[in-house]
């Protein structure tokens, strides 16, 4: 089969991949990913592409929310979500996830993975050691809360940090963030224990807080003053990065070029066209191998170093080694 695929032209593989993803989506496989991104065929696993120094030379801005699997996704995929779980259920769900991530006889990051029961038990024990200090094993809701963090860390945070590290190690400029601000309209319809869910920052970056966003009931999506203030800051960062490819600046007034295009009239005395109330934003440090800095985006943003280091070590180093039956 592999020999036959190698004889196929890339265009045909790309077209077939798109059709395959559509079929999988129709069957409910919403998280199916093929070897094609934006119409380009990936000749190797993304991790190997980085290691082979074949990744594109581009500046990279990437990040996550502080509760990626907090509410939106588990509510869709887990029946009875929000009622609490037992510790056995916590570990069973993580085992099922690991069994899907490391299927039998697949080479990934230089390792060969198997579905051996002992491996899964060792992985579950490692997860429990890292996360157990943060939950009460006798509290079903605390267990479910910690499950959402463990699952989100594995699915979103660890891959993001891994890519940031590999791209920075290749000498590229990388800027990492953890979103810590949820729009008021989203927070109002979630339990109070949910943090910043998957894609919460999208509304802030897009300037939705300054637009009339209609709801199905005929009203407009409400936004508060903190929403608008945070949105201005995020748009300032993103607009500057889009224009210059960098966020390496001293605390200064960053003109909102993209924002001004659709909201503010041009000022003849100011060729940039930025609004008069462009926000003061703190410096966003570059992420490097020696200084894995990241920005904590909030009403008042601040920088820090090392995003969940113990948990990232678990997902990106400890578990891959535990899952490997042998190293190639």
Go through each PLM region and give its residues:
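Substrate-gating cap/lid region and adjacent catalytic-acid/histidine neighborhood
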Residues: 4-228, 237, 258-265
């Amino acid at each position: 089969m592999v020999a036959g695929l190698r004889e196929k032209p890339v265009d045909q593989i790309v077209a077939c991949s798109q059709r395959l993803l559509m079929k999988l989506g129709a069957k409910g496989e919403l998280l199916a990913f093929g070897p094609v991104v934006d119409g380009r065929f990936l000749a190797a696993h993304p991790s190997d592409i980085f290691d082979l120094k074949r990744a594109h030379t581009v500046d990279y801005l990437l990040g996550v929310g502080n509760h990626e699997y907090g509410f939106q996704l588990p509510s869709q995929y887990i029946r009875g979500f929000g009622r609490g779980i037992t510790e056995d259920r916590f570990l069973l769900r993580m085992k099922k996830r690991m069994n899907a991530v490391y299927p039998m006889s697949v080479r990934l990051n230089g390792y060969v993975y198997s579905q051996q029961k002992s491996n899964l038990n060792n992985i579950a024990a490692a997860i429990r050691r890292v996360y157990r200090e943060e939950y009460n094993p006798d509290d079903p809701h605390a267990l479910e809360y910690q499950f959402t963090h463990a699952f989100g860390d594995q699915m979103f945070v660890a891959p993001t940090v891994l890519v940031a590290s590999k791209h920075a190690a290749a000498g590229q400029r990388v800027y990492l963030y953890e979103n810590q601000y949820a729009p008021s309209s989203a927070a109002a319809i979630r339990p109070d224990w949910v943090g910043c869910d998957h894609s919460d920052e999208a509304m802030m970056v897009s300037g939705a807080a300054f637009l009339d966003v209609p709801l199905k009931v005929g009203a407009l999506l409400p936004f508060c003053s903190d929403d608008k203030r945070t949105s201005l800051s995020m748009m300032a960062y993103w607009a500057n990065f889009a224009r210059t490819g960098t966020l390496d600046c001293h605390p200064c007034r960053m003109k909102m070029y993209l924002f001004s295009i659709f909201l503010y009239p041009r000022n003849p005395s100011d060729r940039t066209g930025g609004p008069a109330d462009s926000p003061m934003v703190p410096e966003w440090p570059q992420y490097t191998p020696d200084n894995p800095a990241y920005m904590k985006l909030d009403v008042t943003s601040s920088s820090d170093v090392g995003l969940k280091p113990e948990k990232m070590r678990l997902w990106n180093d400890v578990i891959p080694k535990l899952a490997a039956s042998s190293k190639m």
